[in-house]
């Protein structure tokens, strides 16, 4: 007769986890009891395995149980039986392995030196490595020493054969990855008593490797800043240092994790060693930055270069350039109230209420008509009701902090009997802005994360010999349209002006002049400090002038166009004109300002030499023309069995001024593309305007 009893707590976790580490996690929360009546040991262990949904692998071991056995956990139950009946046990892959203690053995397993650490990690991850049994490594020789039950040693040996050893001669070397857009090294911004550190690609990659090697996820990591492992920003002296936002460059964290797992588990991936040095395996991987060449240096196996390239490509992406124009001004609160009353909803230029600047309230205002608002401010500045404190402008990359600081530092001396300390006290106006470009329904917008501190050093009311600091802080974020402005107010101040009026000469007479010929007056004015921030999208790191409507290239083209008109009266198109026409034709629209011609004024083959493998279809063509130039559209076809590229340089005749192919320049066998060719009208050239008769008799001009 046998009977099994179990007590399960109310919060017991399920007994079938996906991966068991040596012993099931549920065993820690479960008590076990077994009531045996002349029960064979094999039968008792089979009942035990059945209760926990496991298989039993056990050779014949003699023993009979005749008692009621209670244990605090299943592990304790097996240990008690093992001591009494001289057997060893371990759990792996939902199987309980039991073997006599006499079958305890040891083995020497040879692996590569780079795979020693990875074999131990792999055995731990799959739940096979048991700390109760012996384990030792000889990293320089590439040898693992293991001791335990025969079945346990056999499983370890089988796993060691699955670890791929690196090819001969494939030793670690320095791999160089030059960067185009991102910074390889960390950037440090010293900001008063704080230190902002924006991590470079080398630090980000090292942090990713460290985090992933410990089983952590990179989804919550701050990939811009660095202040220790996984933190975004390092504060040099302030615990209230704000964190930088996460990158918006479109990082695919899932792809990054997969690539990192390949690096870390491909023949021994690695992270930076902390503490003692270890030989071989992931401890030998090192990542550093080459500041001179803006490159990332990785010391690892050259065979993993492709894996690192995929990771670095996700980080080395171009970002937008944003210019931030800031206007800091003090304005009389009475005039400000009148100004805000004129800039309400009825004006249609401000997204806010008419009473945004009431007394005792902080203010945030959006301006869309910046020109009219600036005119109002200039008028107030002219009559003395407003004064501009500063008008700085700074250019920065999106998601990178821009800091503007106007501060004053006083030094406070604290003396004692033998010690004198000097503490700096800093106050003033500081502005920290982190911009980010957005696209909402095709309309560009800019998100601003703003931190403002405004303060000044005054004389203390308690001790005249000690300074007093008055500060105000604003931390906010907003999304505004491009070319709009954000106004932040709420910094109130009281300004007192003492004026003395006296009669010349008589007012300087002692005693009498002060009483009879002088008068004093004090004017108190309440002022509010405003911060007007205007972000402008300049471009990106690939083409900084991409978003400039009147950039330098177009200005040069316009001036050259005017010079050409004065020289020969012809109006030749600029690059912008040709690009605009080609874009309209790609979109399926007829070019503006051009009429549809019936036939081409040129022979098809005279426009372009298609080259070997390509042919131009003369039956299918279009011609759009204006007075001085036009665009011919022909069809190019690949007649070969290999991909062929349309070479635009072959369309470089005397009349051609621009060429483009759509939808593809590379044509697969049998594929066709349209070729747009911008050409000058023959009649506008000087040869067409003027003719010269030939001196040869019978020759045609």
Curated annotation (Swiss-Prot):
Protein's UniProt name: Type 3 secretion system secretin
The primary gene name is sctC
Task: Provide a GO CC annotation, any one.
Answer: type II protein secretion system complex
Q: Where is the composition biased (Polar residues)?
A: 240-252
- Annotated function: Component of the type III secretion system (T3SS), also called injectisome, which is used to inject bacterial effector proteins into eukaryotic host cells. Forms a ring-shaped multimeric structure with an apparent central pore in the outer membrane. Involved in the secretion of a proteinaceous elicitor of the hypersensitivity response in plants.
Xref: Pfam families? Secretin, Secretin_N
What InterPro entries has UniProt attached to this entry? Bact_Secretion_Sys_Channel, NolW-like, NolW-like_sf, T2SS/T3SS_dom, T2SS_GspD_CS, T3SS_OM_pore_YscC
Its assembly, as annotated, is: The core secretion machinery of the T3SS is composed of approximately 20 different proteins, including cytoplasmic components, a base, an export apparatus and a needle. This subunit is part of the base, which anchors the injectisome in the bacterial cell envelope. Forms a stable homooligomeric complex.
Composition bias, Gly residues: 229-238
Q: From what superkingdom does this record's organism come?
A: Bacteria
Q: Which family does it belong to?
A: Belongs to the bacterial secretin family. T3SS SctC subfamily.
| Leader sequence residues | 1-21
Record keywords, A-Z: Cell outer membrane, Hypersensitive response elicitation, Membrane, Protein transport, Signal, Translocation, Transport
The record's listing under Gene3D superfamilies reads: 3.30.1370.120, 3.55.50.30
State the compartments where it is located.
Answer: Cell outer membrane
Q: Which region ranges are annotated with the description Disordered?
A: 229-252
Which Gene Ontology BP annotations are present? protein secretion by the type III secretion system; symbiont-mediated perturbation of host programmed cell death
Q: Which PROSITE patterns match?
A: T2SP_D
